[in-house]
């Protein structure tokens, strides 16, 4: 629901929400984002109603809501990756990483709840194993994207790396805390243990929160356009978007 409200900021005004419904543009990524978001919210509400009524169809609605959640993450990732004006987002890794982060944060929250409610050691071990595996996938994707950015050697990548450097502490929190949690959950002596699972889940939640901040901060701080002037070999540089024009 909070993400649905956040779409209003992208629309510019609440009155534009009606235009999204009446005059929807199927070529717009934001339109598909709205469809996926609304579908997920509706199915989630129906599932909660079925749980409250103890209906037999709870599992069916749970599967449908789960599929809608996966589709939502893919659409969200595609929405970001198609924004070519923001080099920090414009990467094919983004949709896959969105899925990985969804599993990481989701299972970390479930693991935290399981620890608080005193779940069995077998359940904690199973949840921890899935969460740690998802963390490994996310970290590999994040490091691959960073290596690609270093090897690109373009003005856009230089601006992005500069923005990352200015937020290096936040970036390290994003990587190090989930890495520590992954090691804790993978260690045989910690499997099924409440205290390590509780600490690891908290570390993951903090790390993923830092990841979401890093998703926004470098994208908006890095120059969106580059200006290249003819005449010399050293004329390519960042061009601020604030003037509202791009000059050749």
Give names to the regions the model predicted.
Residues 1-2, 24, 66, 201-203:
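Short hydrophobic "helix-edge" motifs at membrane interfaces and signal-peptide entry regions
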Residues 184-187, 192, 197, 201-228, ...:
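Feature marks hydrolase-like catalytic cores characterized by long aromatic- and Gly/Pro-rich stretches
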């Amino acid at each position: 629901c909070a993400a649905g409200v956040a779409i209003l900021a992208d629309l510019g005004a609440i009155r534009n929400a009606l235009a999204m419904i009446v005059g929807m543009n199927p070529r717009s990524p934001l339109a598909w984002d709205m469809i996926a978001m609304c579908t997920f919210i509706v199915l989630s509400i129906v599932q909660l109603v079925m749980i409250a009524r103890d209906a037999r169809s709870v599992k069916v609605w749970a599967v449908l809501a789960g599929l809608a959640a996966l589709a939502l993450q893919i659409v969200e990732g595609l929405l970001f990756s198609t924004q070519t004006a923001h080099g920090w987002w414009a990467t094919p890794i983004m949709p896959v990483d969105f899925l990985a982060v969804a599993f990481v944060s989701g299972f970390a929250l479930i693991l935290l709840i399981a620890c608080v409610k005193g779940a069995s050691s077998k359940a904690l071990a199973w949840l921890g194993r899935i969460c740690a595996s998802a963390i490994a996938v996310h970290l590999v994707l994040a490091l691959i994207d960073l290596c690609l950015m270093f090897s690109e050697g373009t003005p856009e990548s230089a601006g992005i790396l500069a923005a990352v450097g200015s937020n290096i502490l936040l970036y390290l929190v994003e990587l190090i805390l989930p890495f520590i949690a992954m090691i804790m959950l993978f260690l045989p002596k910690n499997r099924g243990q409440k205290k390590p699972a509780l600490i690891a889940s908290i570390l993951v939640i903090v790390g993923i929160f830092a990841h979401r901040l890093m998703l926004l901060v470098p994208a908006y701080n890095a120059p969106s356009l580059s200006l290249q002037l003819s005449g010399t070999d050293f004329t390519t540089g960042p061009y601020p978007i604030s003037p509202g024009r791009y000059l050749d």
